[in-house]
Amino acid sequence: MWDMIKNFFLFSSGVLQATTLLLVILIFMYVRKTKKKNKESSGFMDDKH
């Protein structure tokens, strides 16, 4: 019983780490893309005010 629970936690934590890593990479790429766009249009923050 404990082995099953331990294995499940090891597996889920591994999946969680992989998912987090994937999310971080996706967000990083998205941020870089938007920053590039902002430089071209210039004044993204200025439009909000």
From Swiss-Prot:
Primary site of residence: membrane
Bilayer topology term: Single-pass membrane protein
Subcellular location: Cell membrane
Keywords, ordered alphabetically: Cell membrane, Membrane, Transmembrane, Transmembrane helix
GO cellular component, one term: plasma membrane
Membrane-spanning intervals of the chain: 8-28
Protein name from the UniProt record: Uncharacterized membrane protein YyzH
Organism: Bacillus subtilis (strain 168)
